[in-house]
Amino acid sequence: MKKIAVLISGQGSNLQAIIEACQTGFIPGKIVTVISNKIDSFGLERAKSAGIPSRVFLRQDFSSNLDMDKAIGDYLDDINVDLIVLAGYMKILTKPFTQRFAGKILNIHPSLLPKYPGIHTYQRALENGESEHGTTVHFVNEEIDGGAIVLQAKVPIFPGDTVEEIELRTREQEYNIYPLVIKWFIEDRLKLIENQAYLDGKLLPPNGYAYE
């Protein structure tokens, strides 16, 4: 069974969706570790409740980001992880780390990339008068919220919507599409070849597939 590592910083709601997808067998893999860069991350409690080992790596314990990422990478190599899943990991990965695990790191971002990389995506979409928003699962490279896009899910923005309403709508889609993409990877259906995403041997379009 393939081994999955999940990196978190906060509540771990996407982590919970992935845990449940593994427990039901929807994802035919095993989460072997949950890593957090925040000691008070509630996601660590979710891991504990599911019987999943966890580790905390704090920036203050290392002389540089490079050293921290090297330590995390060495740990992941020691336990022979097949896939690294970023689930609300609010620390930018260093270039050596993304190169070391190229094609083995997935991230989910709360926008329809390439629109709205970075933070405050719901607020920015609302302020710009967008009629839709969404979420994107993509491979990770050294570019922030870059990397080949795999799958996107759209949500409507209605007149009078608040940021919180858009976020709730988007998160519900995240819990659907992230386990699905992880499933594809674990089943060897999804691959990154020369910085492009392929599913079942077919090159995905630049914005990935649209989840319906």
Regions found by a protein language model. Name each.
Residues 36-37, 65-66, 79-95:
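N-terminal glycine-rich "phosphate-gripper" loop used for MgATP/nucleotide binding
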Residues 55-60, 108:
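Short beta->alpha connector loops at strand-helix junctions that form conserved
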Residues 1-42:
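N-terminal Rossmann-like dinucleotide-binding module
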Residues 32, 82, 103:
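Conserved acidic residues
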Residues 50-51, 101:
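Short, structured coil segments at secondary-structure junctions
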Residues 16, 195-212:
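Short, basic/aromatic-enriched C-terminal tail that caps enzymatic domains
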Residues 21, 87-200:
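Donor/substrate-binding cores of folate-linked one-carbon enzymes
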